[in-house]
Regions:
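Hydrophobic faces of well-ordered beta-strands that scaffold small-molecule active sites
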Residues: 80-82, 108-110, 138-140, 177, ...
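His/Asp/Glu-enriched, well-ordered alpha-helical/loop segment
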Residues: 223, 265-347, 353
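Histidine-rich, glycine-flanked metal-binding segment
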Residues: 4-77
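Di-metal (Zn2+ and/or Mg2+/Mn2+) metal-binding site signature of metallo-dependent hydrolases
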Residues: 73-95
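Divalent-metal coordination cores built from histidine and acidic residues
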Residues: 3-16, 96-205, 268
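C-terminal cap of metal-dependent C-N hydrolases
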Residues: 334-376
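Glycine-enriched alpha-helix->loop->beta-strand junction motifs that scaffold or abut catalytic
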Residues: 172-173, 220-228, 243-249, 271-274
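Conserved small/polar residues in nucleotide/adenosyl-binding loops
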Residues: 394-397
Length: 397
């Protein structure tokens, strides 16, 4: 987030907070959901460029070049989806952006695993190029399992530790994507150990996939350097991994497990700081009607999780998970990603502010995102010529 280190921006924001110059955008009349204390309190928000300059008592300032009156609505930080695959939704990044941004999701962490398994480094390059100018913030990760099953398939590339290390050296890459080859990591196999070590050496997160791991195997996976998991199988699995110290990403794609997770968290009596939310895989129709991570928040609350906890998991905890101190909190000095909600059950976004700009209203983006051409990836499915023998069958009697 180096743009927020701009000295002139900070001076302008400081002057606006003092009252010596107007805000670029003033949001007034809202009720702030405080992700630190859990309180609901009336507050106005002054924004300069992409930065929150002031969170102050309602009605104490009226000087904004643009004023957004949200009287009675709730103010939440923008939602952060800490693990997802655009490919699973079978849409382009620009289409995905417009589908979720309109509902309050302002940051997603993309593992372009399928792109890389077909197209290799050019697939990862496309993920970066196709997202860099979108109003939805994409944190692109370096796929760790290309191919996903070494020796068992014909992938379009082979990412060893050196390849992953090269990707991690790029500032656009936010970490190592989910490490699915758990057994080789636990066994200390050189290839996977080297990939995990590349993430540690780069000082970037190493994301996990710890489905079914328990006891010594789980401890070994974590000791290798993997820090998170989204592949929970039960409430007891959730609690073991929380107690072990993994950062848990509750995912919405296994809806049947969410009530069990909610029951365990409610029994615990508080939301751990190491619980964030993710979608992982969302089918196109669910994306269209649910809005991505917003729908996960909505369902968790419907199953009985306090709305403040669900939002904290989707904002402040998510920011902590991805190491972004500029996100996840409505406070002076933080990035101005804000969603304005009419209530805390339906979670319908009245307005969405991303990077200091109003980008959506009543579930629709104000400007459609621009597509980046994908021509190099056309005709990439290579099959033998279709013959009559290929579709013939023998009738069995």
């Amino acid at each position: 987030p180096l743009d927020l280190a701009d000295g002139s921006l900070r001076l302008r924001a400081t002057a606006a907070a003092r009252g010596d110059r107007p805000f670029d955008l003033l949001i007034r009349g809202g009720v702030l959901i405080d992700m630190v204390t859990g309180e609901h309190r009336p507050a106005d928000i002054g924004i300069v460029g992409p930065l929150i300059a002031s969170v102050h008592a309602p009605g104490t300032r009226s000087d904004g070049h643009e004023v957004l009156d949200v009287t009675g609505a709730f103010l939440s930080p923008g939602l952060i989806d800490t693990h997802m695959h655009v490919e699973s939704s079978m849409v382009t990044p620009a289409t995905y952006c417009d589908a979720v941004l309109a509902h309050g999701v302002t940051t997603v962490v993309w593992d372009p695993h399928e792109f890389a398994n077909v197209h290799g480094i050019p697939g990862v390059d496309y993920a970066i190029r196709a997202t860099e100018d979108l109003p939805l913030r994409f944190v692109v990760l370096a796929p760790s399992c290309v191919p996903s099953a070494p020796g068992q398939e014909h992938a379009g590339a082979d990412f060893d530790a050196a390849t992953v290390s090269g990707l991690l050296a790029r500032p656009e890459i936010g970490g190592v994507a989910e490490v699915m080859n758990m057994r080789d990591v636990i066994a200390g196999e050189p290839r996977m150990s080297g990939i995990v070590q590349a993430g540690l050496a780069a000082g970037k997160p190493v994301c996990g996939h710890a489905r079914g791991l328990t006891g010594p195997a789980l401890q070994a996976f974590m000791a290798a350097g993997v820090g998170s998991d989204h592949e929970l199988t039960s409430g007891s699995d959730l609690m073991e991994k929380l107690r072990a110290g993994l950062f848990i990403e509750l995912r919405g794609s296994h809806d049947h497990l969410l009530p069990e997770f909610v029951a365990e968290l409610n029994r615990l009596g508080h939301l751990p700081q190491t619980v964030s939310l993710c979608t992982d895989d969302v089918f196109p129709d669910d994306l269209l009607h649910g809005g991505g991570l917003t729908d996960v928040v909505r369902r968790l609350v419907g199953y009985g999780l306090p709305s403040e906890w669900a939002l904290q998991a989707a904002t402040l905890n998510g920011a902590r998970k991805i190491g972004r101190d500029d996100l996840g909190l409505i406070a002076a000095g933080r990035r101005a990603d804000i969603v304005i909600l009419d209530d805390l059950k339906a979670f319908v976004a009245r307005h969405v502010v991303a990077n200091g700009r109003v980008v959506a209203h009543d579930g629709e983006v104000l400007r459609a995102s621009v597509e980046v051409g994908a021509a190099p990836f056309l005709n990439s499915v290579r099959l033998p010529a279709l013959t009559t023998d290929a579709v013939s069958y023998t009738h069995l009697t």
